Amino acid sequence: MAMSLIQACCSLALSTWLLSFCFVHLLCLDFTVAEKEEWYTAFVNITYAEPAPDPGAGAAGGGGAELHTEKTECGRYGEHSPKQDARGEVVMASSAHDRLACDPNTKFAAPTRGKNWIALIPKGNCTYRDKIRNAFLQNASAVVIFNVGSNTNETITMPHAGVEDIVAIMIPEPKGKEIVSLLERNITVTMYITIGTRNLQKYVSRTSVVFVSISFIVLMIISLAWLVFYYIQRFRYANARDRNQRRLGDAAKKAISKLQIRTIKKGDKETESDFDNCAVCIEGYKPNDVVRILPCRHLFHKSCVDPWLLDHRTCPMCKMNILKALGIPPNADCMDDLPTDFEGSLGGPPTNQITGASDTTVNESSVTLDPAVRTVGALQVVQDTDPIPQEGDVIFTTNSEQEPAVSSDSDISLIMAMEVGLSDVELSTDQDCEEVKS
Protein backbone atom coordinates (compact mmCIF):
# COMPACT_ATOMS: atom_id res chain seq x y z
CA MET A 1 0.00 0.00 0.00
CA ALA A 2 2.79 2.39 0.94
CA MET A 3 4.77 1.64 -2.21
CA SER A 4 1.73 2.07 -4.47
CA LEU A 5 0.99 5.41 -2.79
CA ILE A 6 4.56 6.55 -3.30
CA GLN A 7 4.49 5.51 -6.97
CA ALA A 8 1.23 7.37 -7.52
CA CYS A 9 2.62 10.52 -5.90
CA CYS A 10 5.79 10.20 -7.96
CA SER A 11 3.83 9.97 -11.21
CA LEU A 12 1.59 12.88 -10.23
CA ALA A 13 4.51 15.10 -9.27
CA LEU A 14 6.41 14.27 -12.45
CA SER A 15 3.39 14.99 -14.65
CA THR A 16 2.73 18.26 -12.82
CA TRP A 17 6.35 19.31 -13.20
CA LEU A 18 6.45 18.58 -16.93
CA LEU A 19 3.14 20.34 -17.63
CA SER A 20 4.15 23.36 -15.58
CA PHE A 21 7.51 23.57 -17.29
CA CYS A 22 6.01 23.40 -20.79
CA PHE A 23 3.28 25.90 -19.92
CA VAL A 24 5.70 28.40 -18.40
CA HIS A 25 8.12 27.96 -21.29
CA LEU A 26 5.43 28.69 -23.89
CA LEU A 27 4.19 31.70 -21.96
CA CYS A 28 7.71 33.05 -21.65
CA LEU A 29 8.19 32.74 -25.40
CA ASP A 30 4.87 34.45 -26.06
CA PHE A 31 5.64 37.34 -23.72
CA THR A 32 9.13 37.72 -25.11
CA VAL A 33 7.95 37.94 -28.71
CA ALA A 34 5.14 40.34 -27.83
CA GLU A 35 7.33 42.68 -25.78
CA LYS A 36 9.91 43.89 -28.30
CA GLU A 37 11.18 47.31 -29.26
CA GLU A 38 12.68 48.49 -32.52
CA TRP A 39 14.80 51.63 -32.39
CA TYR A 40 17.38 53.41 -34.50
CA THR A 41 20.54 55.24 -33.64
CA ALA A 42 21.43 58.53 -35.28
CA PHE A 43 24.73 59.88 -36.50
CA VAL A 44 25.18 63.46 -35.30
CA ASN A 45 27.60 65.51 -37.38
CA ILE A 46 28.27 69.03 -36.09
CA THR A 47 30.33 71.65 -37.84
CA TYR A 48 31.38 74.97 -36.37
CA ALA A 49 34.04 77.60 -36.92
CA GLU A 50 35.80 78.60 -33.74
CA PRO A 51 37.69 81.89 -33.94
CA ALA A 52 41.41 81.52 -33.48
CA PRO A 53 42.90 83.60 -30.64
CA ASP A 54 44.68 86.71 -32.02
CA PRO A 55 46.41 88.90 -29.42
CA GLY A 56 46.92 91.73 -31.89
CA ALA A 57 43.29 91.89 -32.98
CA GLY A 58 40.83 94.23 -31.31
CA ALA A 59 37.59 93.30 -29.73
CA ALA A 60 35.69 94.11 -32.88
CA GLY A 61 38.33 92.74 -35.16
CA GLY A 62 38.28 89.22 -36.48
CA GLY A 63 41.18 86.90 -36.86
CA GLY A 64 41.36 83.57 -38.60
CA ALA A 65 38.75 80.91 -37.75
CA GLU A 66 39.40 77.23 -37.19
CA LEU A 67 36.80 74.88 -38.67
CA HIS A 68 35.79 71.86 -36.55
CA THR A 69 33.77 68.84 -37.62
CA GLU A 70 32.65 66.06 -35.27
CA LYS A 71 30.62 63.00 -36.19
CA THR A 72 29.44 60.51 -33.59
CA GLU A 73 26.71 57.89 -33.41
CA CYS A 74 25.38 59.27 -30.17
CA GLY A 75 21.78 60.08 -31.09
CA ARG A 76 18.63 57.99 -30.84
CA TYR A 77 15.47 58.58 -32.84
CA GLY A 78 12.21 59.15 -31.03
CA GLU A 79 9.55 56.46 -31.04
CA HIS A 80 7.21 58.38 -33.37
CA SER A 81 9.85 60.29 -35.29
CA PRO A 82 10.24 59.72 -39.03
CA LYS A 83 13.47 57.84 -39.68
CA GLN A 84 15.07 60.27 -42.11
CA ASP A 85 17.91 62.75 -42.38
CA ALA A 86 17.76 66.38 -41.25
CA ARG A 87 20.07 69.35 -41.61
CA GLY A 88 20.08 72.85 -40.18
CA GLU A 89 21.57 75.45 -37.90
CA VAL A 90 21.33 74.65 -34.18
CA VAL A 91 19.44 77.23 -32.10
CA MET A 92 18.09 77.49 -28.56
CA ALA A 93 15.28 79.46 -26.98
CA SER A 94 15.87 83.20 -27.05
CA SER A 95 15.33 83.58 -23.33
CA ALA A 96 17.29 81.59 -20.77
CA HIS A 97 14.05 81.26 -18.83
CA ASP A 98 12.44 79.44 -21.78
CA ARG A 99 15.31 77.05 -22.47
CA LEU A 100 13.13 74.02 -21.52
CA ALA A 101 10.59 74.99 -24.24
CA CYS A 102 7.57 73.92 -22.18
CA ASP A 103 5.68 77.15 -22.87
CA PRO A 104 3.82 77.23 -26.21
CA ASN A 105 4.88 80.87 -26.58
CA THR A 106 8.57 80.04 -26.39
CA LYS A 107 10.56 81.96 -28.97
CA PHE A 108 13.64 80.45 -30.63
CA ALA A 109 16.53 82.44 -32.05
CA ALA A 110 15.73 81.15 -35.50
CA PRO A 111 17.77 82.32 -38.50
CA THR A 112 16.31 84.26 -41.37
CA ARG A 113 13.20 82.88 -43.05
CA GLY A 114 13.82 80.13 -45.54
CA LYS A 115 16.81 78.65 -43.73
CA ASN A 116 16.48 75.30 -41.96
CA TRP A 117 17.17 75.22 -38.25
CA ILE A 118 17.25 72.59 -35.50
CA ALA A 119 15.97 73.28 -31.98
CA LEU A 120 18.24 72.21 -29.10
CA ILE A 121 16.21 71.65 -25.92
CA PRO A 122 17.22 70.17 -22.54
CA LYS A 123 15.13 67.45 -20.93
CA GLY A 124 12.81 68.23 -18.04
CA ASN A 125 9.67 69.99 -16.66
CA CYS A 126 7.28 68.71 -19.34
CA THR A 127 6.74 65.85 -21.75
CA TYR A 128 8.78 65.21 -24.84
CA ARG A 129 5.68 65.71 -26.95
CA ASP A 130 5.15 69.25 -25.63
CA LYS A 131 8.73 70.25 -26.32
CA ILE A 132 8.72 68.80 -29.82
CA ARG A 133 5.31 70.30 -30.66
CA ASN A 134 6.32 73.80 -29.52
CA ALA A 135 9.40 73.69 -31.74
CA PHE A 136 7.48 72.18 -34.64
CA LEU A 137 4.88 74.98 -34.49
CA GLN A 138 7.70 77.47 -35.08
CA ASN A 139 8.82 75.63 -38.24
CA ALA A 140 11.85 73.80 -36.86
CA SER A 141 13.33 71.22 -39.22
CA ALA A 142 14.23 68.86 -36.36
CA VAL A 143 14.36 68.77 -32.58
CA VAL A 144 17.35 67.59 -30.54
CA ILE A 145 16.74 66.93 -26.84
CA PHE A 146 19.73 66.22 -24.64
CA ASN A 147 19.50 64.20 -21.44
CA VAL A 148 19.85 65.95 -18.09
CA GLY A 149 20.13 64.60 -14.57
CA SER A 150 20.30 60.84 -15.19
CA ASN A 151 23.07 58.71 -16.60
CA THR A 152 25.21 61.12 -18.58
CA ASN A 153 25.61 58.82 -21.57
CA GLU A 154 22.09 57.40 -21.54
CA THR A 155 19.62 57.95 -24.35
CA ILE A 156 16.11 56.57 -24.67
CA THR A 157 13.50 56.17 -27.33
CA MET A 158 11.34 59.20 -26.63
CA PRO A 159 7.55 58.75 -26.87
CA HIS A 160 5.83 61.70 -28.55
CA ALA A 161 2.56 60.45 -29.99
CA GLY A 162 0.66 63.07 -31.97
CA VAL A 163 3.78 64.86 -33.20
CA GLU A 164 4.99 62.56 -35.95
CA ASP A 165 5.92 64.91 -38.77
CA ILE A 166 9.24 66.15 -37.46
CA VAL A 167 12.57 64.45 -36.86
CA ALA A 168 13.27 64.18 -33.14
CA ILE A 169 16.34 62.61 -31.56
CA MET A 170 17.92 62.44 -28.11
CA ILE A 171 21.64 62.90 -27.47
CA PRO A 172 23.68 62.36 -24.29
CA GLU A 173 24.14 65.14 -21.77
CA PRO A 174 27.87 65.77 -22.46
CA LYS A 175 27.22 66.25 -26.16
CA GLY A 176 24.30 68.58 -25.50
CA LYS A 177 26.26 70.72 -23.04
CA GLU A 178 29.14 70.95 -25.48
CA ILE A 179 26.84 72.41 -28.15
CA VAL A 180 25.22 74.74 -25.60
CA SER A 181 28.62 76.12 -24.63
CA LEU A 182 29.40 76.84 -28.28
CA LEU A 183 26.07 78.61 -28.79
CA GLU A 184 26.57 80.69 -25.65
CA ARG A 185 29.85 81.91 -27.17
CA ASN A 186 27.92 83.00 -30.28
CA ILE A 187 29.51 80.31 -32.42
CA THR A 188 27.34 79.10 -35.26
CA VAL A 189 26.86 75.34 -35.16
CA THR A 190 25.48 73.38 -38.09
CA MET A 191 24.14 69.88 -37.47
CA TYR A 192 23.57 67.08 -39.92
CA ILE A 193 21.50 64.10 -38.67
CA THR A 194 21.63 60.78 -40.53
CA ILE A 195 20.14 57.36 -39.82
CA GLY A 196 22.36 55.00 -37.88
CA THR A 197 21.95 51.36 -36.84
CA ARG A 198 18.65 49.52 -36.56
CA ASN A 199 18.25 47.72 -33.24
CA LEU A 200 15.67 45.17 -32.15
CA GLN A 201 15.49 44.78 -28.40
CA LYS A 202 13.26 42.28 -26.64
CA TYR A 203 11.78 42.98 -23.25
CA VAL A 204 9.95 40.86 -20.73
CA SER A 205 7.13 42.79 -19.16
CA ARG A 206 6.72 43.04 -15.42
CA THR A 207 3.53 40.98 -15.62
CA SER A 208 5.30 38.13 -17.34
CA VAL A 209 8.17 38.26 -14.85
CA VAL A 210 5.73 38.05 -11.93
CA PHE A 211 3.81 35.22 -13.58
CA VAL A 212 6.93 33.22 -14.37
CA SER A 213 8.27 33.78 -10.86
CA ILE A 214 5.04 32.62 -9.24
CA SER A 215 4.86 29.59 -11.54
CA PHE A 216 8.45 28.70 -10.75
CA ILE A 217 7.86 29.06 -7.00
CA VAL A 218 4.72 26.91 -7.16
CA LEU A 219 6.58 24.33 -9.21
CA MET A 220 9.43 24.24 -6.72
CA ILE A 221 7.02 23.96 -3.78
CA ILE A 222 5.26 21.01 -5.42
CA SER A 223 8.57 19.31 -6.17
CA LEU A 224 9.92 19.97 -2.69
CA ALA A 225 6.72 18.73 -1.05
CA TRP A 226 6.84 15.58 -3.13
CA LEU A 227 10.49 14.97 -2.26
CA VAL A 228 9.83 15.49 1.44
CA PHE A 229 6.82 13.17 1.32
CA TYR A 230 8.74 10.57 -0.67
CA TYR A 231 11.72 10.48 1.68
CA ILE A 232 9.51 10.47 4.78
CA GLN A 233 7.58 7.50 3.42
CA ARG A 234 10.79 5.79 2.41
CA PHE A 235 12.30 6.37 5.84
CA ARG A 236 9.17 5.11 7.60
CA TYR A 237 9.00 2.05 5.39
CA ALA A 238 12.66 1.24 6.00
CA ASN A 239 12.25 1.64 9.75
CA ALA A 240 9.11 -0.48 9.78
CA ARG A 241 10.82 -3.16 7.76
CA ASP A 242 13.84 -3.21 10.07
CA ARG A 243 11.57 -3.33 13.09
CA ASN A 244 9.58 -6.20 11.58
CA GLN A 245 12.76 -8.07 10.77
CA ARG A 246 13.90 -7.70 14.36
CA ARG A 247 10.55 -8.97 15.62
CA LEU A 248 10.66 -11.90 13.24
CA GLY A 249 14.21 -12.59 14.39
CA ASP A 250 13.07 -12.63 18.00
CA ALA A 251 10.22 -14.97 17.09
CA ALA A 252 12.66 -17.20 15.23
CA LYS A 253 14.98 -17.33 18.25
CA LYS A 254 12.03 -18.29 20.43
CA ALA A 255 11.06 -21.02 17.98
CA ILE A 256 14.62 -22.32 17.73
CA SER A 257 14.85 -22.56 21.50
CA LYS A 258 11.84 -24.92 21.44
CA LEU A 259 13.31 -27.25 18.84
CA GLN A 260 14.85 -30.52 19.96
CA ILE A 261 18.62 -30.94 19.99
CA ARG A 262 20.24 -34.32 19.77
CA THR A 263 23.82 -35.57 19.86
CA ILE A 264 24.62 -38.30 17.36
CA LYS A 265 26.07 -41.42 18.95
CA LYS A 266 28.08 -44.19 17.49
CA GLY A 267 25.82 -46.80 15.96
CA ASP A 268 22.92 -44.43 15.26
CA LYS A 269 21.28 -44.84 11.88
CA GLU A 270 22.30 -41.28 10.95
CA THR A 271 25.94 -42.43 10.81
CA GLU A 272 25.17 -45.07 8.21
CA SER A 273 26.40 -44.43 4.67
CA ASP A 274 22.94 -44.67 3.10
CA PHE A 275 21.47 -42.01 5.40
CA ASP A 276 20.89 -38.57 3.91
CA ASN A 277 23.58 -35.96 4.42
CA CYS A 278 22.99 -32.57 6.00
CA ALA A 279 21.23 -30.51 3.34
CA VAL A 280 23.05 -27.34 4.38
CA CYS A 281 26.71 -28.37 4.44
CA ILE A 282 26.26 -31.53 2.26
CA GLU A 283 28.27 -33.60 4.74
CA GLY A 284 27.36 -36.79 6.53
CA TYR A 285 26.67 -37.14 10.21
CA LYS A 286 29.41 -38.37 12.51
CA PRO A 287 29.34 -39.41 16.16
CA ASN A 288 29.23 -36.50 18.62
CA ASP A 289 27.67 -34.21 15.99
CA VAL A 290 24.96 -32.01 17.46
CA VAL A 291 21.88 -31.95 15.26
CA ARG A 292 18.71 -29.88 15.31
CA ILE A 293 15.42 -31.68 14.67
CA LEU A 294 12.72 -29.60 12.97
CA PRO A 295 8.94 -30.16 13.30
CA CYS A 296 8.88 -31.71 9.82
CA ARG A 297 11.22 -34.48 11.13
CA HIS A 298 14.17 -33.24 9.06
CA LEU A 299 17.42 -32.89 10.93
CA PHE A 300 20.52 -30.86 10.22
CA HIS A 301 23.72 -29.90 11.94
CA LYS A 302 22.88 -27.38 14.63
CA SER A 303 25.68 -25.04 13.54
CA CYS A 304 24.41 -25.21 9.96
CA VAL A 305 20.68 -24.82 10.35
CA ASP A 306 20.45 -22.26 13.17
CA PRO A 307 21.70 -19.29 11.07
CA TRP A 308 19.38 -20.39 8.27
CA LEU A 309 16.39 -20.51 10.59
CA LEU A 310 17.17 -17.05 11.97
CA ASP A 311 17.12 -15.58 8.46
CA HIS A 312 14.40 -17.63 6.76
CA ARG A 313 12.40 -19.35 9.52
CA THR A 314 11.73 -22.29 7.19
CA CYS A 315 13.06 -25.79 6.74
CA PRO A 316 15.86 -25.79 4.14
CA MET A 317 14.36 -28.88 2.50
CA CYS A 318 10.56 -28.71 2.64
CA LYS A 319 10.19 -24.95 3.33
CA MET A 320 7.88 -25.55 6.28
CA ASN A 321 7.47 -22.45 8.43
CA ILE A 322 8.65 -23.24 11.96
CA LEU A 323 6.68 -20.35 13.47
CA LYS A 324 3.46 -21.78 12.07
CA ALA A 325 4.35 -25.32 13.03
CA LEU A 326 5.11 -24.35 16.62
CA GLY A 327 2.08 -22.10 16.89
CA ILE A 328 4.11 -18.94 17.52
CA PRO A 329 2.11 -16.07 16.01
CA PRO A 330 4.34 -13.29 14.64
CA ASN A 331 3.48 -9.68 15.31
CA ALA A 332 0.77 -8.32 13.03
CA ASP A 333 3.18 -5.68 11.73
CA CYS A 334 5.41 -8.44 10.41
CA MET A 335 2.83 -9.96 8.08
CA ASP A 336 4.09 -8.17 4.97
CA ASP A 337 7.61 -9.51 5.44
CA LEU A 338 6.66 -13.15 6.08
CA PRO A 339 7.10 -15.82 3.38
CA THR A 340 4.25 -16.38 0.99
CA ASP A 341 3.38 -19.80 2.47
CA PHE A 342 2.32 -18.10 5.71
CA GLU A 343 -1.43 -17.47 5.58
CA GLY A 344 -1.96 -15.31 8.61
CA SER A 345 -1.20 -15.62 12.26
CA LEU A 346 -2.59 -18.63 14.09
CA GLY A 347 -5.11 -18.19 16.86
CA GLY A 348 -5.01 -19.90 20.23
CA PRO A 349 -2.16 -20.46 22.63
CA PRO A 350 1.12 -21.89 21.37
CA THR A 351 1.63 -25.61 21.87
CA ASN A 352 4.79 -27.42 22.85
CA GLN A 353 3.98 -30.61 20.94
CA ILE A 354 3.62 -31.50 17.28
CA THR A 355 -0.05 -32.44 16.96
CA GLY A 356 -1.89 -34.22 14.24
CA ALA A 357 -3.37 -30.95 13.07
CA SER A 358 -0.06 -29.25 12.63
CA ASP A 359 1.36 -32.26 10.84
CA THR A 360 -1.60 -32.28 8.51
CA THR A 361 -1.05 -28.60 7.74
CA VAL A 362 2.56 -29.30 6.89
CA ASN A 363 1.43 -32.12 4.64
CA GLU A 364 -0.80 -29.68 2.72
CA SER A 365 2.09 -27.31 2.16
CA SER A 366 4.19 -29.86 0.26
CA VAL A 367 5.48 -32.18 3.04
CA THR A 368 4.46 -35.85 2.77
CA LEU A 369 4.68 -37.91 5.92
CA ASP A 370 3.89 -41.58 6.51
CA PRO A 371 0.87 -42.41 8.70
CA ALA A 372 2.98 -43.38 11.67
CA VAL A 373 4.75 -40.03 11.69
CA ARG A 374 1.55 -38.05 11.03
CA THR A 375 -0.12 -39.55 14.09
CA VAL A 376 2.90 -39.38 16.32
CA GLY A 377 1.65 -36.18 18.00
CA ALA A 378 -1.70 -37.69 18.81
CA LEU A 379 -0.10 -40.85 20.16
CA GLN A 380 2.16 -38.79 22.40
CA VAL A 381 -0.76 -36.77 23.73
CA VAL A 382 -3.06 -39.72 24.45
CA GLN A 383 -0.75 -42.60 25.31
CA ASP A 384 2.56 -40.89 26.11
CA THR A 385 4.25 -43.68 24.19
CA ASP A 386 6.82 -43.81 21.43
CA PRO A 387 5.16 -44.83 18.13
CA ILE A 388 8.49 -45.95 16.68
CA PRO A 389 10.17 -48.38 19.08
CA GLN A 390 13.49 -48.46 17.28
CA GLU A 391 16.30 -46.84 19.19
CA GLY A 392 17.62 -43.76 17.53
CA ASP A 393 14.32 -42.69 16.05
CA VAL A 394 13.35 -39.16 16.91
CA ILE A 395 10.16 -37.98 18.54
CA PHE A 396 9.82 -34.19 18.42
CA THR A 397 9.25 -32.90 21.93
CA THR A 398 10.05 -29.37 22.92
CA ASN A 399 9.99 -30.07 26.64
CA SER A 400 10.20 -33.64 27.85
CA GLU A 401 9.39 -32.66 31.40
CA GLN A 402 6.07 -30.96 30.61
CA GLU A 403 3.28 -32.92 28.94
CA PRO A 404 0.21 -30.92 27.88
CA ALA A 405 -3.07 -31.79 29.52
CA VAL A 406 -5.76 -33.22 27.25
CA SER A 407 -9.52 -33.04 27.73
CA SER A 408 -11.64 -36.19 27.78
CA ASP A 409 -13.41 -35.22 24.56
CA SER A 410 -10.12 -34.98 22.70
CA ASP A 411 -9.01 -38.38 24.08
CA ILE A 412 -12.15 -40.06 22.76
CA SER A 413 -11.90 -38.41 19.32
CA LEU A 414 -8.24 -39.25 18.86
CA ILE A 415 -8.61 -42.86 20.07
CA MET A 416 -11.56 -43.42 17.74
CA ALA A 417 -9.61 -41.99 14.84
CA MET A 418 -6.68 -44.33 15.47
CA GLU A 419 -8.92 -47.37 16.00
CA VAL A 420 -10.72 -46.86 12.73
CA GLY A 421 -7.36 -46.26 11.01
CA LEU A 422 -8.05 -42.71 9.85
CA SER A 423 -4.46 -41.66 9.78
CA ASP A 424 -5.31 -38.81 7.41
CA VAL A 425 -7.68 -36.99 9.72
CA GLU A 426 -7.27 -33.23 9.29
CA LEU A 427 -7.83 -31.11 12.34
CA SER A 428 -8.20 -27.36 11.95
CA THR A 429 -6.17 -24.91 13.96
CA ASP A 430 -9.19 -23.86 16.03
CA GLN A 431 -10.01 -27.49 16.91
CA ASP A 432 -6.41 -28.09 17.86
CA CYS A 433 -6.50 -25.08 20.20
CA GLU A 434 -9.68 -26.44 21.86
CA GLU A 435 -8.35 -29.98 22.20
CA VAL A 436 -4.80 -29.31 23.34
CA LYS A 437 -4.40 -26.83 26.21
CA SER A 438 -0.94 -25.78 27.22
From Swiss-Prot:
Any coiled-coil regions, as ranges: none
Taxonomic source organism: Homo sapiens
Side of membrane Cytoplasmic, spans: 230-438
Signal sequence, renumbered to the chain: 1-34
Main location: membrane
SMART domains in the cross-refs: RING
Name recorded for this polypeptide: RING finger protein 150
Glycan attachment sites: 45, 125, 153, 186
Gene that specifies this protein: RNF150
